[in-house]
């Protein structure tokens, strides 16, 4: 009898313990009341430690919908779980080794990022949704003040298959660096993206961690950037429309200069200076102040600023008249955007719309300026990671519409370069022709004479080139060290396989010859390794299995950016791997890249 009593007592204890365990699990996993705020790591990133406190997200509750528990368990918990495998390999957001590959999973994520997005998604994910960026404005801009009665802004961001981390970093940068009373709303237009994380997971994140003024509109089919922006603008209710790309980061005091000019003249369209975010390293760097132009192939180009634009009393902070805009980032009074005809809805997807709206602004009574005191960073990719839905050449289609509506007799300059397009169909332009008449627009000759006199017209009577600001070229980076790149284990030096001047040539290990100047490397403050003062050591960002080669120095970092780290390793920033000797026993001396492990095959020293 006693044994039976003890047995049931034990059963009771077990049942009670199990009940409390279940209750505590439910409470801590599903309660939404008074849970402590914590850093939100990025899904899919590699191992790294916690980021500094100043980078922690500032959470703001979105609209209070009842959350589905299963969704929370499967999506949001996975979003918060960074799958940290080795916290000792912690990396700060400013680390040059933020893109380091630790395992095959990191390598797959990095390679997938270049394939899907044409930039380093591994680094993007590790950066998180908040980071500090350098204030790249001229010092005079920091002393400027702006009116208190500025108009409110609707930020329109159209995206298609964007990287989740890049999109949210764009949104958070706007929320973090825009005064709340000026930010009327952020409208995200999903142009029928295919990626799952841009659907329910994005909605849930916005609901939980962003203000209610962040809204998502989803197109039922692919409309393209042009019509996507028109859809976003149709939903906007702020006084000013600000269009941004989906892989940007706005800088400090970015919005106030734009709004101040529009407050002064609602018929003025303004663009920020577009700073550079490297596609390979995501490093943020300043851009020079230039202005937009175009060529007779109807492609946008950047021009130096004419001397005539630089003599005003405001000096380096003065707005710069720009004949055209790049198109990705600009602000415009919402009513003026509608009155001026929005975009040409007959244009498809992307391409040419920036020139069309630029010509229309100037020819129909408006103004277009670039503002040096407004800065926005933009990831500049080397290619577009996606095409048109049907594979059509939208740039040609859109350029033809532009030429036939706005160029008048100067469209023959375009057709002289593209005679194959003279009889190509471009759709019905009657509405746009009628719009031009209704707005009472000037001729294209007026535009060339008054807005872009620097534009050359080929022919025997070509006008002389107008003077422009002298460009003295970029300053040469300072040399930090000069010597032979010595491999500690083999006692050999890294040299060119053939001539040191051969572009695309391989490098390998050979016996060091201290009398041979072609074995001498220069390491400079831009982290370039230059052999014989001729070519840079370069890696393919998209084919990390390829060996390093000697290529012309491009000065953009990324594929030519190397750092000497601990354990004498030579780390390639954009590839995220270290230089190694392929086989220590092989006399051929071939080198390649591998996951950094501090092994003897990866130990190098630059010796004078």
Curated annotation (Swiss-Prot):
Where, by residue number, does the polypeptide cross the bilayer? 7-29
User: Which residues, renumbered to this chain, carry the PTM Phosphoserine?
Assistant: 95
Q: What is its EC number?
A: 2.4.1.41
Q: What class of enzyme is it?
A: transferase
Renumbered residue ranges of the record's region Catalytic subdomain A:
150-261
Q: Where is the Ricin B-type lectin domain?
A: 476-607
Topology within the bilayer: Single-pass type II membrane protein
Cofactor(s) essential for the protein: Mn(2+)
Q: In which pathway does it act?
A: Protein modification; protein glycosylation
Map out region (Catalytic subdomain B) in residue numbers. Answer: 319-381
Glycosylated sites: 423, 428
Binding positions (Mn(2+)): 245, 247, 378
**Pfam families per record:** Glycos_transf_2 (PF00535), Ricin_B_lectin (PF00652)
Q: Taxonomically, which superkingdom?
A: Eukaryota
Under SMART domains, the record lists: RICIN
Which controlled-vocabulary keywords does the entry list? Disulfide bond, Glycoprotein, Glycosyltransferase, Golgi apparatus, Lectin, Manganese, Membrane, Metal-binding, Notch signaling pathway, Phosphoprotein, Signal-anchor, Transferase, Transmembrane, Transmembrane helix
| GO MF terms held by the record | carbohydrate binding; metal ion binding; Notch binding; polypeptide N-acetylgalactosaminyltransferase activity
Q: Name one GO biological process term.
A: Notch receptor processing
A single GO CC term for this protein reads: Golgi membrane
Q: What is its main location?
A: Golgi
Q: How does it assemble?
A: Interacts with NOTCH1.
Q: Which family does it belong to?
A: Belongs to the glycosyltransferase 2 family. GalNAc-T subfamily.
Question: What does this gene product do?
Answer: Polypeptide N-acetylgalactosaminyltransferase that catalyzes the initiation of protein O-linked glycosylation and is involved in left/right asymmetry by mediating O-glycosylation of NOTCH1. O-glycosylation of NOTCH1 promotes activation of NOTCH1, modulating the balance between motile and immotile (sensory) cilia at the left-right organiser (LRO). Polypeptide N-acetylgalactosaminyltransferases catalyze the transfer of an N-acetyl-D-galactosamine residue to a serine or threonine residue on the protein receptor. Displays the same enzyme activity toward MUC1, MUC4, and EA2 than GALNT1.
Q: What is known of its domains?
A: There are two conserved domains in the glycosyltransferase region: the N-terminal domain (domain A, also called GT1 motif), which is probably involved in manganese coordination and substrate binding and the C-terminal domain (domain B, also called Gal/GalNAc-T motif), which is probably involved in catalytic reaction and UDP-Gal binding. The ricin B-type lectin domain binds to GalNAc and contributes to the glycopeptide specificity.
Q: What is this protein called?
A: Polypeptide N-acetylgalactosaminyltransferase 11
């Amino acid at each position: 009898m006693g044994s039976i009593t003890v047995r049931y007592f034990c059963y009771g204890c077990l049942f009670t313990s199990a009940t409390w365990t279940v209750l505590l699990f439910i409470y801590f996993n599903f309660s939404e009341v008074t849970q402590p705020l914590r850093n939100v790591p990025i899904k899919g990133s590699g191992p790294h430690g916690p980021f500094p406190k100043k980078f922690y997200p500032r959470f703001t509750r979105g609209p209070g919908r009842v959350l589905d528990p299963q969704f929370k368990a499967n999506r949001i918990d996975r979003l918060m779980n960074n799958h940290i495998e080795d916290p000792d390999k912690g990396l700060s957001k400013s680390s040059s080794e933020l893109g380091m590959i630790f395992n095959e999973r990191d390598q797959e994520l990095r390679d997938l990022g270049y394939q899907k997005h044409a930039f380093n998604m591994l680094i993007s994910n590790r950066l998180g949704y908040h980071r500090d960026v350098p204030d790249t404005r001229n010092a005079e801009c920091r002393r400027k003040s702006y009116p208190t009665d500025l108009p409110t802004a609707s930020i329109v961001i159209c995206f298609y298959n964007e990287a989740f981390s890049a999109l949210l970093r764009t949104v958070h940068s706007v929320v973090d660096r825009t005064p709340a009373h000026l930010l009327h709303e952020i409208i995200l237009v999903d142009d029928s993206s295919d990626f799952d994380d841009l659907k329910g997971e994005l909605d849930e994140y916005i609901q939980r961690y962003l203000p209610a003024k962040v809204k998502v509109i989803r197109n039922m089919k692919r409309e393209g950037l042009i019509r996507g922006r028109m859809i976003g603008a149709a939903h906007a209710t702020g006084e000013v429309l600000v269009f941004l790309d989906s892989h940007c980061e706005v800088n400090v005091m970015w919005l106030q200069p734009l709004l101040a000019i529009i407050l002064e003249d609602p018929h003025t369209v303004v663009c920020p200076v577009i700073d550079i975010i490297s596609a390979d390293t995501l490093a943020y760097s300043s851009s020079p102040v230039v202005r937009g132009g175009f060529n007779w192939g109807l492609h946008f180009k950047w021009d130096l600023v004419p001397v005539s634009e630089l003599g005003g009393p405001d000096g380096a902070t003065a707005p710069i008249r720009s004949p055209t805009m790049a198109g990705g980032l600009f602000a415009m009074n919402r009513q003026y955007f509608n009155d001026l005809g929005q975009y040409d809805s007959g244009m498809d997807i992307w391409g040419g719309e920036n020139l069309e709206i630029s010509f229309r602004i100037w020819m129909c009574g408006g103004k277009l300026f670039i503002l040096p005191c407004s800065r926005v960073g933009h990831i500049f990719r080397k290619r577009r990671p996606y095409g048109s839905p049907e594979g059509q050449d939208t740039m040609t289609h859109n350029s033809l519409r532009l030429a036939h509506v706005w160029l008048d007799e100067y469209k023959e300059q375009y057709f002289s370069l593209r005679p194959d397009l003279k009889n190509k169909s471009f759709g019905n332009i009657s509405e746009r022709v009628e719009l031009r008449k209704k707005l009472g627009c000037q001729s294209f000759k007026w535009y060339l004479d008054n807005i872009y006199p620097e534009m050359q017209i080929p022919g025997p009577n070509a006008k002389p080139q107008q003077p422009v600001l002298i460009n003295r070229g970029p300053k040469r980076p300072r040399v930090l060290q000069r010597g032979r790149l010595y491999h500690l284990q083999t006692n050999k030096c890294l040299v060119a396989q053939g001539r040191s001047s051969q572009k695309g040539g391989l490098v390998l290990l050979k016996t060091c010859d201290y009398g041979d100047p072609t074995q001498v490397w220069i390491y400079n403050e831009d982290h370039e390794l230059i052999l014989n003062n001729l070519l840079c050591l370069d890696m393919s960002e998209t084919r990390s299995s390829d060996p390093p080669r000697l290529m012309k120095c491009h000065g953009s970092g990324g594929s030519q950016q190397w750092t000497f780290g601990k354990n004498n390793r030579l780390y390639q920033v954009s590839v995220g791997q270290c230089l190694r000797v392929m086989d220590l026993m092989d006399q051929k001396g071939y080198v390649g890249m591998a996951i950094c492990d501090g092994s003897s095959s990866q130990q190098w020293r630059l010796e004078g």
